[in-house]
Design a protein with these regions (language model features):
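N-terminal helix-turn-helix DNA-binding core of bacterial DNA-binding proteins
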Residues: 20-60, 92
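Amphipathic alpha-helical dimerization/coiled-coil segments
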Residues: 4, 102-125
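N-terminal leader segment of winged-helix/HTH proteins
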Residues: 1-29
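Short amphipathic alpha-helical interaction elements located at domain edges
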Residues: 1-5, 67, 78-80, 122
C-alpha cells in the first residue's frame, strides 16, 4: 500500500505495511531519526537545522533533510522563520506532533524500567 505525499521538490512515498494504526504510526515515526527529531523538539522547543546536527546521536545532513521534509509534509512539524532569513529557519511541533509527547514519555519510562538491566547507563525517568 503505497501513498504519495506531495513535497516542494518531489513526491515522497510512504509504503504502508498494513492498515493497522500501530504499524502505520511506526511507518512514520518508527525509524530512529524521525522519533529523535520529535524528541528534540519536545525537549528543547523550536530547533534549527544546525541544532539538530549537534544531537549526540550524530544524524547525517542528508538523512536530517529527508526526515525534516517528511515530518513537515505529514504535518507533525512545521518550519518557522522569525526574521524571514533562510539562515534562521527553525522547526517546531504542530499540534499533531505535540500529541506524541505522552507516547514518548511512556516509551522512555518503559525503557528505564525494563532495559536498565541490560543498559547500565540508561537515564531514569
Amino acid at each position: 500500500m503505497r501513498d504519495e505525499i506531495k513535497t516542494s521538490d518531489a513526491n515522497l512515498e510512504i509504503d504502508w505495511r498494513s492498515i493497522c494504526p500501530i504499524s502505520s504510526a511506526l511507518d512514520v515515526i518508527g525509524d530512529k531519526w524521525s522519533i529523535l527529531i520529535v524528541r528534540d523538539l519536545i525537549i528543547h522547543g523550536p530547533r534549527t537545522y544546525s541544532q539538530f546536527l549537534e544531537s549526540p546521536e550524530g544524524i547525517s545532513t542528508n538523512i536530517l533533510a529527508t526526515r525534516l521534509e517528511l515530518l513537515t509534509n505529514l504535518k507533525l512539524i512545521e518550519r518557522i522563520n522569525p526574521d524571514k532569513s533562510s539562515r534562521n529557519n527553525a522547526y517546531q511541533l504542530t499540534p499533531a506532533g505535540a500529541a506524541l509527547r505522552p507516547v514518548l514519555e511512556n516509551l522512555g519510562k518503559w525503557a528505564a524500567l525494563h532495559l536498565s538491566e541490560f543498559h547500565s547507563n540508561i537515564l531514569k525517568m
